[in-house]
C-alpha cells in the first residue's frame, strides 16, 4: 500500500491487516508511542472538521509523530498555486500528506506530483478512513465480518460508497436504503457489486425499509451535506420516514447502530437511540483514531 485514496484499491487481506493493526495499537498504545518518531505529516483541510482533525492530530502525536495543520488558506488547493507545485513542495518537507478535500481529482494530483504517501481523509466520492473505523467497530462485536448484514440509511454519498466497497471486498452484505432520487453513485455501486461477486458478499440499493429486516447493524448519516442549502422542511418531508428510532429497531430487529457524525438529533436519529443500549456511535468515533493510526503506520513503516 503506497497511498490510501479509496478502499477499492485494497485487497481483503490488506483491510484485515489494517483492522488487526488498529486493534493492536488500541490495546497497547505504549508499544507504538514512538512508531512515528521523527515523522512529520501535513494534514490539509478544505472542509470543516471535528473528528477527522482531532483524531489525526492526536493520533499522530500518540505515535510520536508531528502533525502540521493547513486549512484552506486562500481557497482550495490549486487556486493559489498549482496542485503540482503544492505537492512538490510539501513532499520536500513532510513524510506524508493527509487531505480532506472537495474533489477526488485533487487527491489524484497530490499522488501524481508528490513523492510521499497520500491519505484521503474525505473527498466528494469516498471516505475510506471512516469506513475502516466503521468495520473496526463492527469487528469488535462480530468475529466474522463477512457474515455481517449492514444497512446504510439516508442519502447516498461518499460514506455510503466507502461502506459498500469495504463490505464488498470483505464479503459482507451491505444495503443502502435511500429515498428515491438519493441513491449512491451508480458507477460506484456497480464496482461494489463486482467486488462482492468475487468475495461472496452482496450489495443492494433500495428505498424499502422492509428489505433490512433481521439485519445486524444500521448506519445513519446527516441528511444535509456541508454546503447544501435545501430548506429544512423539504429535507424532513423526504427523509423523515427513514429516521433511525426505537420503532425502526423493533421493526427490523437490528442490534447495533452506527452514525459517522455530526448527528442532528431528532432528525436522522433520535437521542433515545443515539444514547441507548444499541448505539456504538461513540466507540465508532474513537475508532477513527485507531484505524487512521494503522493506515499511517502501514504507509510509513
Swiss-Prot record:
Protein name: Ornithine carbamoyltransferase
Molecular function terms, GO-annotated: amino acid binding; ornithine carbamoyltransferase activity
SUPFAM superfamilies xref list: Aspartate/ornithine carbamoyltransferase (SSF53671)
Job of this protein: Reversibly catalyzes the transfer of the carbamoyl group from carbamoyl phosphate (CP) to the N(epsilon) atom of ornithine (ORN) to produce L-citrulline.
Assembly, per entry: Homododecamer.
GO biological process, one term: arginine biosynthetic process via ornithine
PANTHER family, per database record: ORNITHINE CARBAMOYLTRANSFERASE, MITOCHONDRIAL (PTHR45753), ORNITHINE TRANSCARBAMYLASE, MITOCHONDRIAL (PTHR45753:SF3)
Pfam families: OTCace, OTCace_N
Protein keywords: Amino-acid biosynthesis, Arginine biosynthesis, Cytoplasm, Transferase
Binding site for L-ornithine: 158, 221, 225-226
Domain of life, per lineage: Bacteria
Residues the record lists as binding carbamoyl phosphate: 100, 127-130, 260, 288
Amino acid at each position: 500500500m503506497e497511498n490510501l485514496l479509496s478502499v477499492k484499491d485494497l485487497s481483503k487481506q490488506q483491510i484485515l491487516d489494517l483492522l488487526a493493526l488498529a486493534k493492536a495499537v488500541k490495546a497497547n498504545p505504549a508499544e507504538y508511542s514512538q512508531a512515528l518518531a521523527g515523522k512529520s505529516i501535513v494534514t490539509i483541510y478544505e472542509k470543516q472538521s471535528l473528528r477527522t482533525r482531532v483524531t489525526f492530530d492526536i493520533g499522530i502525536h500518540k505515535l510520536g509523530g508531528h502533525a502540521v495543520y493547513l486549512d484552506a488558506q486562500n481557497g482550495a488547493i490549486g487556486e493559489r498555486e498549482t496542485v503540482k507545485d503544492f505537492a512538490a513542495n510539501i513532499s520536500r518537507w513532510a513524510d506524508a500528506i493527509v487531505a480532506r478535500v472537495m474533489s477526488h481529482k485533487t487527491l489524484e494530483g497530490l499522488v501524481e506530483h508528490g513523492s510521499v504517501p497520500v491519505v484521503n481523509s474525505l473527498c466528494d466520492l469516498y471516505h475510506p478512513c471512516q469506513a475502516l473505523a466503521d468495520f473496526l467497530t463492527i469487528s469488535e462485536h462480530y468475529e466474522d465480518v463477512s457474515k455481517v448484514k449492514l444497512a446504510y440509511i439516508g442519502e447516498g454519498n461518499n460514506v455510503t460508497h466507502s461502506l459498500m466497497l469495504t463490505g464488498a471486498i470483505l464479503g459482507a452484505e451491505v444495503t443502502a436504503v435511500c429515498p428515491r432520487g438519493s441513491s449512491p453513485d451508480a458507477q460506484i455501486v456497480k464496482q461494489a457489486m463486482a467486488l462482492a461477486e468475487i468475495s461472496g458478499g452482496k450489495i443492494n440499493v433500495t428505498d424499502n425499509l422492509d428489505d433490512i429486516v433481521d439485519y445486524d447493524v444500521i448506519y445513519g448519516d446527516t441528511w444535509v451535506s456541508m454546503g447544501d442549502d435545501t430548506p429544512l422542511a423539504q429535507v424532513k418531508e423526504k427523509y423523515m420516514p427513514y429516521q433511525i428510532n426505537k420503532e425502526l429497531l423493533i421493526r427490523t430487529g437490528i442490534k447495533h447502530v452506527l452514525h459517522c457524525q455530526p448527528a442532528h438529533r431528532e432528525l436522522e436519529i433520535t437521542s433515545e437511540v443515539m444514547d441507548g443500549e444499541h448505539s456504538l456511535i461513540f466507540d465508532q468515533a474513537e475508532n477513527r483514531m485507531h484505524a487512521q493510526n494503522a493506515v499511517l503506520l502501514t504507509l510509513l513503516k
